Regions:
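Extracytoplasmic loops and strand-loop junctions of Gram-negative outer membrane beta-barrel proteins
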Residues: 41-44, 85-86, 126-129, 166-169
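Transmembrane beta-strand segments of Gram-negative outer membrane beta-barrel proteins
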Residues: 27-42, 117, 121
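Cleavable N-terminal export/targeting peptides
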Residues: 1-30
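Gram-negative (and chloroplast) outer-membrane scaffold detector with strong preference
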Residues: 26, 55, 60-144, 149-151, ...
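Surface-exposed strand-loop-strand hairpins of Gram-negative outer-membrane beta-barrel proteins
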Residues: 39-58, 136
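Internal, hydrophobic beta-strand segments that form the core of beta-sheet-rich folds
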Residues: 161-162
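A short acidic/glycine-rich loop-to-helix N-cap element
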Residues: 47-50, 169-176
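Positively charged, low-complexity intrinsically disordered regions
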Residues: 3-6, 31-32, 38, 65, ...
């Protein structure tokens, strides 16, 4: 009787270990990703009176720490020319650098289809580097999404529409909140 219990316990333990190992191996396939993106940085509301939309380049990294939760970090570099002034001429060029940490929630997992959708929200900072006037960094918040299409088990095409709002100084930037939207596309690689 004792050997049957021992055998049953041993068999149950091995089965649980096998199931856990299989689940971990499947889940661990792409727990860490890196991405490179390019696109357009679009200013809106008051900041759009000072600068035009301009090219944007970005990189990001993400770690999946639970089956549907991701910890992400993005850096986007936007290059904006100054807008045309009423009296003629053009305002100064402004480079906007975005540094944002985010929490992402996976709405559509890549195991369900070749598509994946992660919505994200986070906080960080935006630096406004005004040509000829120095730079200032302000706290910022972020919302957005990461929409991927699987090309291979580790490579995805990526769309990354993001909305960043910096809480700026009206005297330095001309508005108390600068809304800048990096709309980028690129590639995401699972490590």
């Amino acid at each position: 009787m004792r050997s049957i219990r021992t055998g049953t316990a041993l068999l149950s333990g091995l089965m649980l270990l096998g199931i856990a190992t299989t689940a971990e191996a499947q889940w661990a396939d792409r727990r860490v990703t890196i991405e490179a993106r390019g696109g357009l940085n679009v200013p809106t509301f008051d900041i759009s009176d000072a600068v035009d939309a301009g090219p944007s380049f970005g990189v990001g990294a993400a770690v999946q720490f639970a089956p549907k939760l991701w910890l992400m970090g993005d850096v986007d570099l936007g290059f904006h020319s100054g807008t045309n002034l009423v009296g003629g001429g053009e305002g100064p060029d402004v480079n906007v650098y975005h540094y944002v940490a985010k929490l992402g929630y996976e709405l559509l997992s890549e195991g369900q289809s070749p598509w994946s959708v992660i919505v994200n929200a986070g906080a960080g900072a935006l630096t406004f580097d005004v040509d000829g006037a120095g730079s200032n960094t302000y706290p910022a918040i972020n919302v957005g999404a990461k929409i991927g299409y699987r090309l291979s088990p580790r490579v995805h095409l990526l769309l990354s529409p993001q909305g960043d709002i910096a809480f700026t100084d009206d005297d330095e930037v001309g508005t108390s909140n600068a809304w800048v939207w990096p709309f980028t596309a690129g590639i995401r690689i699972g490590l």
